[in-house]
């Protein structure tokens, strides 16, 4: 079952890559984030309990870092420029 899920995800990502290359587009940050979220959910479903705790902690840490980078740092830089 797990092999079939991974194989279908790999095929799906390959089809997406072909569609992007035909349209002369590349993956955007939002596309990559969606792919990582989907793969993270699949890994969480099929992982043992100890590994699940590590993965959830890592995902929360990366989410905090991403939102800090996207929202808090620009506010801080804008306040430095205004002074």
UniProtKB/Swiss-Prot annotation:
The chain crosses the membrane at residues 5-22, 32-49, 56-78. GO terms for cellular component: plasma membrane. It is a multi-pass membrane protein. Its main location: membrane. Pfam families: DUF5510. It is found in: Cell membrane. Keywords: Cell membrane, Membrane, Transmembrane, Transmembrane helix. InterPro entries: DUF5510 (IPR035116). This is Uncharacterized protein RP098. It comes from Rickettsia prowazekii (strain Madrid E).
């Amino acid at each position: 079952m797990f092999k079939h899920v991974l194989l279908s995800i790999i095929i799906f990502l390959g089809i997406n890559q072909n569609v992007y290359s035909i349209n002369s587009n590349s993956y955007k940050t939002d596309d990559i984030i969606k792919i990582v979220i989907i793969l993270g959910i699949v890994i969480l479903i099929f992982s043992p309990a100890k590994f699940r705790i590590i993965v959830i902690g890592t995902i929360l840490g990366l989410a905090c870092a991403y939102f800090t980078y996207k929202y808090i740092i620009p506010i801080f830089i804008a306040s430095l420029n205004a002074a």
